[in-house]
Design a protein with these regions (language model features):
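Helix-turn-helix
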Residues: 17-20, 24-66
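Hydrophobic alpha-helical connector segments
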Residues: 77-111, 154
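Hydrophobic/aromatic-rich alpha-helical bundle segments in the mid-to-C-terminal region
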Residues: 126-136, 144-196
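Solvent-exposed, amphipathic alpha-helical segments
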Residues: 20, 24-31, 78, 113, ...
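Amphipathic alpha-helical segments used for helix-helix packing
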Residues: 101, 105-131
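Functional cleft and adjacent loop/helix regions within the main domain
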Residues: 68, 138
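N-terminal intrinsically disordered/low-complexity leader segments
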Residues: 1-16, 192-196
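Short, basic, alpha-helical segments at the C-terminal edge of helix-turn-helix-like DNA-binding modules
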Residues: 69-75
């Protein structure tokens, strides 16, 4: 059922309203930050009645979790697709380079959303479930081509280089990333665990 509307006015079915609110919440966060995100702003961005906010979500924290959950799932899926397409050690290294230069934080919006989530996770351990799951999926995707120790280093390398690329004002940033990519260890089957 939809939230009640004004008396005498027919209610239109809107099965996608909840999804639109979640997407609009991410847009509002990207523009105003978490601190500037309110029910009123999100409702206006989603073009829904204000009452829809509390109908579909228990509160702003509930909405933020849903929105950032969607963002991290989509980011992890892109990471998995890129690494999954690699078939050789050389392609795995190229995939890492492409993740940095094209996929992760590909837009200013993605950069802002990521850092807003990091700030929340630093303050509220509950949000670390989202960031930890994101890291787990990223390392699992890398693990198709690299051993566990290398995966942890590469995950941090991708994160750090991506932030530097996104914030760098010099146009040669992408060239520098590609040069660093050529220094990465060659991919290959993960090393077997040592005997216990």
């Amino acid at each position: 059922p939809a939230p009640p509307g004004p008396p005498g006015r027919a209610r239109r079915p809107d099965p996608e309203r909840r999804d639109r609110i979640i997407d609009a919440c991410l847009d509002v966060i990207a523009e105003h930050g978490v601190e500037g995100t309110s029910h009123r702003r999100v409702a206006a961005a989603a073009d829904v009645p204000l009452g829809s906010m509390t109908y579909h979500f228990a509160g702003m924290d509930d909405l933020l979790r849903e929105a950032f959950g969607r963002f991290t799932r989509e980011a992890a899926a892109q990471f998995e697709r890129r690494m999954g397409d690699a078939r050789t050690p050389e392609e795995a290294v190229q995939a890492v380079t492409t993740l940095i230069t094209h996929d992760v934080f590909a837009t200013q919006r993605d950069l802002v959303l990521s850092h807003e989530l990091y700030t929340l996770a630093a303050r509220d351990p509950a949000y670390r479930t989202l960031t930890n799951d994101w890291m787990r999926r990223s390392r699992a995707a890398l693990g198709r081509h690299f051993d566990p120790a290398t995966c942890r280093v590469l995950d941090a390398f991708i994160e750090g280089m991506t932030i530097h690329r996104a914030l760098d004002t010099e146009p040669h940033a992408a060239v520098a990333v590609r040069g660093a990519g050529r220094r990465l260890p060659r991919g290959g089957p993960p090393a077997p665990s040592p005997p216990r």
